[in-house]
Regions:
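Single conserved hydrophobic/aromatic residue that forms the stacking wall/gate
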Residues: 1-9, 13
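Exported/periplasmic ABC-transporter solute-binding proteins
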Residues: 10-200
């Protein structure tokens, strides 16, 4: 399965590059003015979902390439807290898994939580409308959204143990549909066979 890391903000700033995001996380960029000269929000307040989350590990290993995160970054207790904090704090930038930022009332998963703005991210040196993508499942699957990582199931129990049954369920059609509906891109897409007649 594939999951994306999203950044959500309440400012009018809509796009960022991976390089800018790295500089925010390492503390080189500290103010919204560094990103958008017209911004009046002052210093960035960057929040993560949990001090031990996979999102923080991904940020250190893959985005910052082993560099330390800035000491000014804060970790809250849950993804819901990050969304609530960002929606109420104008200068906040929240970093959470893309599956948490989806609009739960939209069964198509084509919209995001309306209380925050989800930023589009570009792998290029300059973010434009044409090269920046939001973490929609299609862009995660095609790897056009650059902040993606794979999710694996690792088991070391005997083949007949309970964890093996869970793994088989999750990798089967029903399990992959559950993963799809949770906002994560499944490893295998459910197949639908359609028989089309040439004659009427």
């Amino acid at each position: 399965s594939t999951q994306g890391v999203s950044s959500a903000a309440s400012d009018v700033y809509k796009r960022q590059t991976v390089g800018q995001f790295r500089r925010i996380l390492t503390g080189e960029i500290k103010s919204w003015k560094d990103l958008n000269p017209k911004s009046r929000l002052g210093d960035l307040s960057v929040v993560f979902d949990n001090p031990n989350s996979g999102t923080i590990h991904y940020a250190i290993d893959s985005i910052c390439r082993g560099e330390q995160l800035a000491s000014s970054l804060t970790a809250l207790k849950s993804n819901e807290e990050v969304i609530e904090y960002v929606s109420k704090t104008p200068n906040a930038l929240g970093v959470i898994g893309a599956n948490w930022i989806g609009n739960k009332s939209d069964t198509t998963r084509l919209s995001f939580n309306e209380t925050v703005r989800v930023m589009a991210v570009s792998n290029s040196g300059h973010a434009t409308v044409g090269n920046s993508h939001k973490p929609y499942q299609a862009y995660l699957a095609l790897r056009e959204y650059p902040l993606v990582h794979d999710v694996f199931i690792l088991i070391n129990d005997p083949r007949t143990a309970l964890p093996t049954g869970l793994m088989r369920f999750l990798t089967g059609e029903r399990g992959q549909r559950i993963i799809l509906k949770s906002g994560i891109v499944p490893a295998t897409q459910p197949v639908r066979l359609v028989n089309v007649k040439d004659e009427f």
